Amino acid sequence: GILMLDEPFSALDAHLKSVLEQNLVSLFDAFHGTVLYVSHDIDEALRFCDRIAVVETGRITEMGTGDDLVNRPQSLAGVKLSGCKNATAAVRVDERSVRLPKWGIEAATSAAVPEDVKALGVRAFFLQRVDGPGENCYRVRVDRVSDSRFERTVLLGFLDRDESEAPTVSRTDDEMKYLHQHLFWRVDKLAVPADELPHEGEELWIRIPPNKVYLVSR
């Protein structure tokens, strides 16, 4: 048989959700059939599912294990649904570098760049604060910060971006374009002293590790 669940925890508070998730694990263990679980929450999908299918505009764009999706996404939809906060259009420059028009920068990559590369992704917690210029190091300004219990989410604007393909957009002109020109950086508040956390208006240097980017062609 087939058991189908469509976002069963979407309206629950965090405590109740965690309790019911454990009940659901017991149910799955006792059920001898196929479970079709629909979710927009990647962590939820990873906890419950052996294989994950990415669906975009009604079609499956990729399917694999949770590890495949998180560490080796094959499509832009997969990059985004895996929880990657930074995903942007990419143009191949050479075998080891790409141009990222919306960000107005070029970036080096450890992996070979496909001839038909479509996009680059980098997770917000992979970004590194550095002291100054270097490979994949960029001067940025902290344009916005927001705090959760244990993390600070930081919106970074590139200060020396190339505007030839995508002129800089202000927040008041077009909010979505403004956001797409920025990097999202997640800072662990438990690992960084409070007086060293990035704050709005601060200028600093950030590094995109070449070995931590995803390159996809669809």
Regions found by a protein language model. Give the residues of each.
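Generic structural "secondary-structure junction" signal
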Residues: 11, 18, 83-84, 129
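C-terminal boundary and immediately downstream tail of ABC-type ATPase nucleotide-binding domains
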Residues: 71-94, 121
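Non-catalytic connector elements of ABC transporters
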Residues: 85, 96-218
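Secondary-structure boundary/capping residues
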Residues: 33-36, 87, 151
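ABC ATPase nucleotide-binding domains
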Residues: 1-77
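Residues located in well-ordered beta-strands
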Residues: 65, 77, 91, 139-141
